[in-house]
């Protein structure tokens, strides 16, 4: 069988197109004895170390689909809630409905710069550290002024913490 790969296509600041291709990985879960309720479904607790984070997930065997948010999957039921141990990321199902239409995910065919995960995270880190500098650095003839709610020029927003989902 061929090796399965996951391709992430991303666009930073509506201008920098990134492509990160990696081998597919699955979390190795430990199912615990605790139970809770999410959206009125009886859920069981599971934990794992995955992509540099410790995850806690609540899944329901009432919906026997081994899927969940982001790349969290592989449990004997749908993951309805998941969060990392540092509180940086949290996913909670807000509702479910039956879809009767098919909506394909379309690729626009535009060129994306290929890179590994480390380089991908570096681009995002640069953007979060100085969003305006990231944009104007890519377009030398563009200047940008950030204004407050009263129309007064303010300092460029900087130092937004960047905590990548995958480390």
Residue ranges and their predicted role:
Residues 1-167:
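Extended soluble regions of mature proteins
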């Amino acid at each position: 069988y061929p090796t399965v790969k996951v391709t992430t296509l991303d666009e930073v600041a509506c201008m920098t197109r990134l492509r990160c291709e990696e081998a597919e990985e699955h979390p190795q879960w430990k199912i615990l004895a605790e139970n809770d309720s999410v959206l009125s479904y009886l859920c069981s607790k599971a934990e794992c170390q995955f992509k540099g984070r410790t995850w806690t997930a609540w899944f329901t065997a009432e919906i026997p689909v081994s899927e969940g948010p982001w790349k969290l999957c592989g449990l004997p039921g749908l993951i309805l809630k998941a969060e990392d141990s540092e509180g940086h990321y949290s996913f909670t199902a807000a509702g479910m409905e039956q879809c009767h239409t098919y909506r394909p995910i379309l690729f626009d065919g535009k060129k994306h710069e290929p890179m590994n995960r480390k380089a991908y995270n570096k681009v995002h880190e640069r953007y979060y550290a100085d969003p305006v500098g990231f944009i104007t650095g890519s377009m030398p003839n563009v200047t940008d002024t950030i204004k407050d709610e009263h129309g007064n020029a303010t300092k460029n927003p900087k130092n937004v913490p960047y905590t990548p989902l995958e480390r």
